[in-house]
From Swiss-Prot:
Residue stretches spanning the membrane: none
Matches recorded under InterPro entries: KOW (IPR005824), Rib_uL2_dom2 (IPR014722), Ribosomal_uL24 (IPR003256), Ribosomal_uL24_CS (IPR005825), Ribosomal_uL24_KOW (IPR041988), Translation_prot_SH3-like_sf (IPR008991)
Organism per entry: Sinorhizobium medicae (strain WSM419)
Gene: rplX
Protein name (Swiss-Prot/TrEMBL): Large ribosomal subunit protein uL24
Gene Ontology, cellular component aspect: ribonucleoprotein complex; ribosome
Amino acid sequence: MQKIRKGDKVVVLTGKDKGRTGEVIQVMPKEDRAVVRGVNVVKRHQRQTQNQEAGIITKEAPIHLSNIAIADPKDGKPTRVGFKIDGDKKVRVAKRSGDVIDG
């Protein structure tokens, strides 16, 4: 079970976007990276194709999982993630507040 999943609210811990929050769009477990909406935005030069014009486009680049942390559901501050067995399901728990991250 992954600690960070698609749709999670995360906080950037280091780098040029330190302190910013965003939603995880995509997780790449093999590369240990994630794409976060509005974070680590880069400009790329796009060649013209049949269905797209040429020009400079902005998009989110992947960020390493060690540089992001899940936002605590209670106060929005970064927290580590633990696991707990709730009935017959394994759920993620915020270490900071003890709240269940996913139902």
